[in-house]
C-alpha cells in the first residue's frame, strides 16, 4: 500500500472598492493569490483535527506593509509597525464543499498603508497556556495568548489602502 498525503491548499482573495466623486463605488482590485501554509500553521491545524488542542481555529486575518518574502518558517506578519489583525465574525465563516471561506472587511478608516503581506492566524488561548485565576480578590496567574499564524503571502501587486478604499480579504482553504 502506498502512503498518500493530501495537501492543504489555500488562496487569498482581495477585493477592493474605491469611492468615486459621484458617490458610487468602483472595483479597483480583485486578485486571487496562492498562499503558503507555514509550518506552525500546519501543526496547529493537525492538532485541532486530532483533538490534541481544544482550540485552534482561524480567528483573525491580518495585513501589513513588510515586503519580506513568505517562508514556511515564519510565525507572524513581518511588518514592525504598519499592520492590523481583524477578527473573523461568525457570519464570515462559510463552508461549501470542499472549501472553507473566511473573510474580514477592512473599512475605509482601517489599515490605511500599503498592503504587501496578508496572513491568517489562530489567536485563541491554548488549553495548555496559563489562565487567569483569582483566589478571593487576588490574581494568581495571568493569560498570555500566543497567536499561531497559519498562512502568509506577499502580494506582487500591493494595495495602497487609503480612506477612499474599502477591502474584503477572504482566505479560501481546501484539502486536496
Where are these regions (language model features)?
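Small cysteine-rich, disulfide-bonded extracellular modules of the LU/uPAR three-finger superfamily
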Residues: 1-115, 123-176
Amino acid at each position: 500500500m502506498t502512503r498518500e498525503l493530501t495537501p492543504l491548499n489555500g488562496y487569498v482573495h482581495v477585493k477592493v472598492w474605491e469611492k468615486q466623486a459621484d458617490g458610487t463605488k468602483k472595483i479597483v482590485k480583485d486578485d486571487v493569490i496562492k498562499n503558503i501554509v507555514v509550518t506552525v500553521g500546519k501543526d496547529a491545524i493537525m492538532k485541532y483535527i486530532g483533538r490534541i488542542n481544544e482550540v485552534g481555529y482561524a480567528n483573525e486575518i491580518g495585513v501589513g506593509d513588510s515586503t519580506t518574502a513568505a517562508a514556511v518558517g515564519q510565525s507572524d506578519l513581518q511588518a514592525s509597525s504598519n499592520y492590523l489583525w481583524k477578527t473573523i465574525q461568525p457570519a464570515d465563516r462559510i463552508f461549501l464543499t470542499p472549501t472553507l471561506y473566511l473573510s474580514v472587511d477592512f473599512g475605509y478608516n482601517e489599515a490605511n498603508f500599503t498592503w504587501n503581506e496578508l496572513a491568517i492566524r489562530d489567536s485563541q488561548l491554548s488549553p495548555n497556556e496559563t489562565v487567569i485565576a483569582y483566589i478571593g480578590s487576588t490574581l494568581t496567574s495571568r493569560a498570555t495568548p500566543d497567536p499561531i499564524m497559519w498562512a502568509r503571502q506577499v502580494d506582487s501587486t500591493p494595495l495602497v489602502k487609503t480612506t477612499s478604499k474599502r477591502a474584503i480579504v477572504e482566505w479560501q482553504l481546501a484539502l486536496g
